[in-house]
From Swiss-Prot:
Catalyzes the decomposition of L-selenocysteine to L-alanine and elemental selenium. This is Selenocysteine lyase. Its main location: cytoplasm. GO terms for molecular function: selenocysteine lyase activity; transferase activity. Pfam families: Aminotran_5. SUPFAM superfamilies: PLP-dependent transferases. Keywords: Cytoplasm, Lyase, Pyridoxal phosphate, Transferase. The gene is scly.
C-alpha cells in the first residue's frame, strides 16, 4: 500500500510502501465513517434513556453481533476490552483466581492442589508470556513454556498433552504467530483436551480450559470458535483494519467458561468490564468485523497471491543469498507473512531496512523494537539459525498491496543490500 506522501511538481517519486500489516493496519474507510457517525450521533451514555444514549446502546448491540458473527459465536459471549493485552490478562488472571476460589471444594473431595498450572508455548506474544512470568515469579501459578517444533515451527499437540499435570487448569496457545505466520493446531488440541475432561472430572481434578490469542489470524484466515473448540478467544481490532480496541470471546460466559473482572465499577459489560463504553471505537470494531465476515475469503486470496509473488521475486533477485524463515515443512501459515533474512553479507535486519528508500517494514514484533542487535527469541525458538534470526526482516502484505508495490520494494531491498556492500554482479538485475 502506497501512502499519501505529496509529490513536488513533475518529480513523480514512488510513494512509501507499507509492508508491516502484522504490526497494525490502517482503519478501513467504512470503519472511519462508522466512528465519525457514532461521535456525532451516539455521544450519549449507553445506559441512559434519551435519544443519543439509546442510539449508543443500539450501535454497541449491533457491533457485538457483528463481532460474534465474525468468529462464529453468540453476541452474549462477547466482552469489549481496551485491546488484546487486557483481554489476554483477563483470561490468565481469571483462571488463577477461579482455581483458588474452588480449591476448598476440591479439598472437601480430598483432592489437594497447591497452585494452578498453566501451559503455553515459547513463542507467545508478550501480553501472554509476561503476565505468566509475573504469576510464576510471585508464586501464584506454575507455568510450563512448551517449546515449538524447530522443524515445523508450530506447537505439537502431543507435547502439550505430555505437559498436563493434575493441577493444570488452562492452556493458552496463539492461533497464528506474529513473526513466522505459522498457524497453530488449536482445533486439534481442543479435541484432545476434551477427551481428557471426563476422566479428570471423575478424579475431582480441575477442567482444563483453552485460550487462543487470535490477533494475527483474524481478517487473514477464517476463524470459527465452534471449529476451534476454545473457551476464550482474543480479538484485536487494529490488526484487521479496525480501531485500537479489542474484545474477548468467552464460550458460555459464566456457565461453561469462568471470567472474573479485573476492574470494579459501574457494572457495564455485565460487570465483567466496568466503565462507560467507548461507543465510537466499539462501532468501528463492529464495522471492521462485518467487513471480515463478508470478505475474508477475498482478502485471504489476494494476500496469498501477493505474498507468493513477493517471495518469488525475492528468490529470483537474491537467489541463495536470502533465507525465507517463514517456510516450515508440514505447517500452515498466514497468507500475508514473509520473514526473510539477507545472509551475504551478514548484516542486521534493521540495517537492511534503514537503507531502504521506500519500504516501511519491521524486524519483528513492534513490542520488541527496542531489542537492538539481539535476534528474535521467537525465530530462535522456532529453529531459525542465529545468523538468519539476527538479519531477519518481517514483510507482511495487506488488502491493497499490489504487484507493482512488490516490484518496487524488491528493487529497494536490492539497492539497500548493494549500499551495504553486496557485490552488484552477484545479484540479478530487475527488468
Amino acid at each position: 500500500m502506497a501512502d499519501a506522501e505529496s509529490q513536488n511538481g513533475e518529480n513523480h517519486l514512488p510513494h512509501k510502501i507499507y509492508l508491516d500489516y502484522n504490526a497494525t493496519t490502517p482503519p478501513a474507510t467504512e470503519v472511519v465513517k462508522a466512528v465519525e457517525e457514532a461521535l456525532r450521533e451516539a455521544w450519549g451514555n449507553p445506559s441512559s434513556s434519551y435519544t443519543a444514549g439509546c442510539k449508543a446502546k443500539e450501535l454497541i448491540d449491533t457491533a457485538r453481533a457483528h463481532v460474534a458473527k465474525m468468529v462464529g459465536g453468540k453476541p452474549e459471549d462477547i466482552i469489549f476490552t481496551s485491546g488484546g493485552t487486557e483481554a489476554n490478562n483477563m483470561v490468565l488472571f481469571s483462571t488463577v483466581e477461579n482455581f483458588n476460589s474452588t480449591s476448598k471444594e476440591r479439598q472437601n473431595n480430598r483432592v489437594a492442589l497447591a497452585l494452578p498450572h498453566i501451559i503455553t508455548s515459547n513463542v507467545e506474544h508478550d501480553s501472554v508470556a509476561l503476565p505468566l512470568l509475573h504469576l510464576q515469579k510471585t508464586h501464584r501459578a506454575e507455568i510450563t513454556f512448551v517449546p515449538v517444533s524447530t522443524v515445523t515451527g508450530r506447537i505439537e499437540v502431543e507435547d502439550i498433552i505430555s505437559a498436563v499435570r493434575p493441577n493444570t487448569c488452562l492452556v493458552s496457545i496463539m492461533l497464528a504467530n506474529n513473526e513466522t505466520g505459522v498457524i497453530m493446531p488449536v482445533g486439534e488440541l481442543s479435541q484432545c483436551l476434551a477427551s481428557m475432561s471426563k476422566e479428570r472430572s471423575a478424579q475431582g481434578l480441575p477442567k482444563i480450559l483453552l485460550h487462543t490469542d487470535a490477533a494475527q489470524a483474524l481478517g487473514k484466515v477464517e476463524v470459527d470458535v465452534q471449529e476451534l473448540g476454545v473457551n476464550y478467544l482474543t480479538i484485536v481490532g487494529h490488526k484487521f483494519y479496525g480501531p485500537r480496541i479489542g474484545a474477548l470471546y468467552v464460550r458460555g460466559l459464566g456457565q461453561h467458561s469462568s471470567l472474573l473482572p479485573m476492574l470494579y465499577g459501574g457494572g457495564q459489560e455485565r460487570n465483567f468490564r466496568p466503565g462507560t463504553e467507548n461507543t465510537p471505537m466499539i462501532a468501528g470494531l463492529g464495522k471492521a468485523a462485518e467487513l471480515v465476515f463478508l470478505h475474508c475469503a477475498v482478502y485471504e486470496a489476494h494476500m496469498r497471491r501477493i505474498r507468493d509473488y513477493l517471495e518469488e521475486r525475492l528468490e529470483a533477485v537474491f537467489e541463495d543469498r536470502i533465507r525465507l524463515n517463514s517456510r516450515f515443512p508440514g505447517a500452515e501459515r498466514l497468507p500475508n507473512t514473509c520473514n526473510v533474512s539477507l545472509l551475504k553479507p551478514a548484516m542486521l535486519g534493521h540495517e537492511w531496512l534503514s537503507h531502504c528508500q521506500y519500504l516501511q517494514a519491521s524486524i519483528g514484533a513492534a513490542c520488541h523494537s527496542d531489542r537492538g542487535d539481539r535476534p528474535s527469541p521467537v525465530l530462535l525458538n522456532s529453529g531459525v539459525p542465529q545468523e538468519a534470526a539476527t538479519s531477519a526482516v518481517r514483510l507482511s502484505v495487506g488488502r491493497e498491496t499490489s504487484q507493482d508495490d512488490v516490484d518496487l520494494i524488491v528493487r529497494d531491498l536490492e539497492q539497500a543490500a548493494q549500499l551495504l556492500g553486496v557485490n552488484k554482479k552477484s545479484l540479478k538485475k530487475l527488468p
